[in-house]
Amino acid sequence: MASQGQRVSWGDESTKRRGRSNSRGRKNNDIPLSFFNPITLEQGSKFWDLCPRDFVPKGIGNKDQQIGYWNRQTRYRMVKGRRKNLPEKWFFYYLGTGPHADAKFKQKLDGVVWVARGDSMTKPTTLGTRGTNNESKALKFDVKVPSEFHLEVNQLRDNSRSRSQSRSQSRNRSQSRGRQLSNNKKDDNVEQAVLAALKKLGVDTEKQQRSRSKSKERSSSKTRDTTPKNENKHTWKRTAGKGDVTKFYGARSSSANFGDSDLVANGNGAKHYPQLAECVPSVSSILFGSHWTAKEDGDQIEVTFTHKYHLPKDDPKTGQFLQQINAYARPSEVAKEQRQRKARSKSVERVEQEVVPDALTENYTDVFDDTQVEIIDEVTN
């Protein structure tokens, strides 16, 4: 494929043969997520016979990038040990992305139907795929949708998943309480027998009980769980604790581009997390100092805000913060910078003979000089 691409042309291909195949399609394991909701068909309908050539969803990319393919996802359910096939689903991906990211436009592939608007370019787009922490978008088209196509709408998956988890946790807690009560009853019987024997020997058991009770209270306060409680919360209200943050916010991508491998793997347990957090605006600053917009997106409301603020160039925290932006796209460069910083740090420790306050723990003031860095943060939920 030429690097510059060319304008779309359908002159060398028959509509009937766009993606038709005889097999059941590829496996659905580890398929990248589509930006859009899927399409299902009426029973007996063939997607490749009905799909218009310019059947590209609206809402993402420029005019040159309105090109891609619909990918078939086969589905089934096991019922009493037997496989029961479910209706196929078709998901849209832009050219150069998704499960067939390396395929050329109009390349004959199993379970793939190519589509493009007339003024698009036949070169790979840079639009990527949807992150795991983002909701899929409702399908909208400039062309007429075939009556046999059913456009799926977003389901409240988080709510149903939360209810399922809540029921499971409730059962587990009930079983745990039952076992605990049984064990406690046995322990109480043994304890009462021991206390009675000690009392006969003249031992002050009440004093020992008070001491043991205080010890238990201190122990329970030390082992209190500080892990953030994220159950039944929207994705945008969850808080990452110590550990991998991708399970809450997805892998690093163009829509979630902050954090190197160390920060993503350790969350707020990362070495420089406190200093990085100091560079982030407060809730009230975001709420009252941002530009907000909202629009309907299927059965949900999509909210976008843009927030601009300044950081001083000569503050060490600013340099650390900037290094985390788009770090996922340059892993080798980031690793080299980290090694250099570590070497410089060891060199300074050997040379210096006195303890110097750590500049990275200084607090910001509201007044900065003219040597500043401007950061514009746009978040869409």
UniProtKB/Swiss-Prot annotation:
Modified residues (Phosphoserine): S9, S253, S255
Predominant location: virion
Ranges for region Disordered: 1-29, 152-239, 331-353
Region RNA-binding, residue ranges: 33-159
Coiled coil: none
Keywords: ADP-ribosylation, Host Golgi apparatus, Phosphoprotein, Ribonucleoprotein, RNA-binding, Transcription, Transcription regulation, Viral nucleoprotein, Virion
Protein's recorded name: Nucleoprotein
Organism: Canine coronavirus (strain Insavc-1) (CCoV)
